Amino acid sequence: MPTFSYSASKAAVHHLTRVLAAQLVKENILVNAIAPGPYPSNMLGAAVNHDYSEIEKRNPRKRVGTPEDIAGLVIFLCSRAGAYTVGETITSDGGIVKTASHNLS
């Protein structure tokens, strides 16, 4: 089944993050987003019949994400360490996006 609307909504989040960040940074409001890759969820579970083994095999980190992975990013963005991060969409996917062009075989 095509996922055009899902893909469009993801792209909208990326763009909205940049636009809001540019507008709100003047008021000292920082806007950033997290783009999670494969994490256990109802949506992903339904797509793979709750068998994440194939996703884990294809992921450079050999696993799906955990709540702690997202929590670490949230803590970073909410702390002084993230105080200079503005308008970023941080991908948390175990390296899938960054290594995709190297795995075209």
What are the residue ranges of the model-derived segments?
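Alpha-helical segment proximal to the catalytic Tyr-Lys
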Residues: 22-26, 83
